[in-house]
Amino acid sequence: KPGRGLQVGSVNMDRVTEYLGFHPALHDVSPTELIDTRVLVEAGVLPHVARRMQEDASLYERLNAINLNLRQARSLARWVELDIAFHRELICASRLSPLMAFTDVLAVFFRRFRESVKKAEWSQGIESHQRIIDALQAGHVGEADQEMRAHIESHRERLPS
């Protein structure tokens, strides 16, 4: 009988992204586009995160806990996992739910920039994270913005020529 075949209700892009390791739209994005996208999204959420931190101290505590765990990371894999977690938590802390879709960019970024992350001075990254969240907690969005931009832009210096 007609209508008795297979029906697909919906596709869960989160599961597809998890399986593929990236959202299909991010497959051919250049390294500079990834950096620019991260700067735009992550610097853009900072005023919202600062405002939310004033209302909810646990946001700072969660970000600080991730950063403390980064200090204990001894392998590149663990470092990348925690660094992604930090930046994802920062975006999520904005409570701007449409931007949470951009957290896929983080996984793609760290996969593509693995060599850059290897060469980066991890302690500088940790201290940069700390300056960002401390500035946000104090309500100094401009300082946090400057630090975030420098933090992400530093990967340009390590791009292959």
Describe each model-derived feature in a short phrase.
Residues 34-115, 125-129, 143-154:
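Conserved amphipathic alpha-helical segments that form helical-bundle/coiled-coil interaction surfaces
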Residues 153-161:
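Short arginine-rich
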Residues 120-124:
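Short helix-capping and inter-helix turn/linker motifs at the boundaries of alpha-helical repeat units
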Residues 1-41, 47, 161:
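Short linear motifs at protein or domain termini
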